[in-house]
């Protein structure tokens, strides 16, 4: 009996041990799969995660929709995807990508560090339909710029009637494009630039991160241009099911992302510098102010519609005004 009891205890201990060491599957969206910048960043994070008691198995996904569906289906215990898609799990973090909300890398750095701070831990966790989700990291992917096939489309007025590829899962893009009188062409992250390159659409918004992998230069050709004016800041969220990870893992992971945010911006600066100067079209001060006001109006409208989180809108405005006190909106209410 004693031997049987000891055998049972040993089996139980081994079972618990194997459970605690079981690999945690994390789906990582990267346009270039394993060779992409995001996947390489995830590999460094996974190495650090071992020190927090998690054995992470990274699963590359070049189609973001597939990565998200795998997470929903339980094939992955976490997913690293754009905040625009991750907004469904956490509106506070997902609203950093609001239209015109983060006009520079300096503002982005302040906002990301604040959001990931321990004081906002409760805002990083949500309970949806009985399922718990937690944002365990936010990484910047850079400002999104508008690319046009014809550099003569150099104002809002001239964008009227033009076809603009928008991501179907982000209603904010569709609403904003319609506000300027352009035609929203519903697309996905896997084909929105392809439509620009083959002439199905006249305009597209994307960060420098996508310039080479998606070959945006093919759509620009010899007559295209990039508005050197950031429309929004693209970020990626690491969404986890906290029960699948060791206790306290979420905050340790968020602290890691804060420490590495400067490294991420170094990558972004390198990618932005890689876009040839011949394509970059600067706006005059009057047009720049006009666009800022248009984005502000759209942002406030989308917040009223419940698409953006009001608390994050307040955080973004404070960060913008801390970096640029002369900003016209700093003396205005409404956000």
Model-derived regions, located:
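Bacterial N-terminal signal peptides
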Residues: 8-16
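Bilobed "Venus flytrap"/periplasmic-binding protein-like clamshell domains
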Residues: 23-52, 132-198, 202
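Sec/Tat signal peptide C-region and signal peptidase I cleavage site
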Residues: 16-22
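N-terminal (or domain-start) structured segment
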Residues: 23-82, 88
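Bacterial N-terminal signal peptides that target proteins for export
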Residues: 1-8
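Contiguous mixed-secondary-structure segments that line small-molecule binding/active-site clefts
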Residues: 82-179, 230-335
């Amino acid at each position: 009996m004693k031997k049987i009891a000891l055998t049972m205890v040993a089996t139980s201990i081994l079972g618990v041990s194997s459970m605690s060491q079981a690999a945690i599957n994390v789906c990582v969206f990267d346009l270039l799969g394993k060779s992409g910048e995001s996947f390489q960043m995830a590999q460094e994070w996974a190495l650090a995660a071992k020190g927090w008691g998690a054995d992470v198995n990274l699963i590359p996904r070049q189609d973001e929709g597939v990565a998200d569906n795998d997470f929903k289906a339980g094939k992955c215990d976490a997913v690293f995807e754009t905040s625009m898609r991750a907004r469904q799990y956490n509106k506070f973090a997902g609203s950093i990508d609001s239209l015109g909300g983060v006009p520079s890398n300096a503002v982005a750095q302040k906002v990301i560090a604040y959001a990931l701070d321990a004081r906002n831990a409760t805002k990083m966790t949500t309970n949806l339909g009985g399922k718990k989700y937690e944002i365990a990291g936010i990484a910047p992917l850079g400002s999104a710029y508008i690319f046009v096939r014809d550099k003569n489309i150099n104002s809002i007025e001239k964008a009227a009637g033009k076809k603009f590829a928008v991501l179907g899962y982000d209603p904010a893009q569709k609403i904003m494009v319609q506000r300027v009188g352009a035609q929203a062409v519903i697309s996905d992250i896997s084909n929105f630039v392809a439509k620009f390159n083959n002439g199905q659409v006249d305009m597209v918004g994307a960060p420098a991160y996508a310039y080479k992998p998606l070959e945006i230069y093919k759509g620009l050709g010899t007559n295209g241009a990039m508005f050197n004016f950031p429309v929004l800041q693209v970020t990626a969220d690491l969404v986890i099911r906290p029960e699948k990870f060791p206790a306290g893992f979420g905050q340790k992971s968020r602290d890691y992302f804060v420490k590495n945010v400067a490294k991420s911006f170094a990558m972004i600066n390198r990618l932005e510098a890689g876009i040839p100067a011949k394509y970059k079209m600067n706006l005059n001060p009057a047009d720049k102010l006009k666009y800022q006001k248009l984005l502000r109006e759209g942002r406030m409208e989308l917040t009223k519609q419940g698409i953006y989180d009001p608390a994050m809108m307040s955080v973004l405005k404070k960060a913008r005004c801390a970096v640029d006190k002369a900003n016209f909106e700093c003396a205005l209410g409404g956000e």
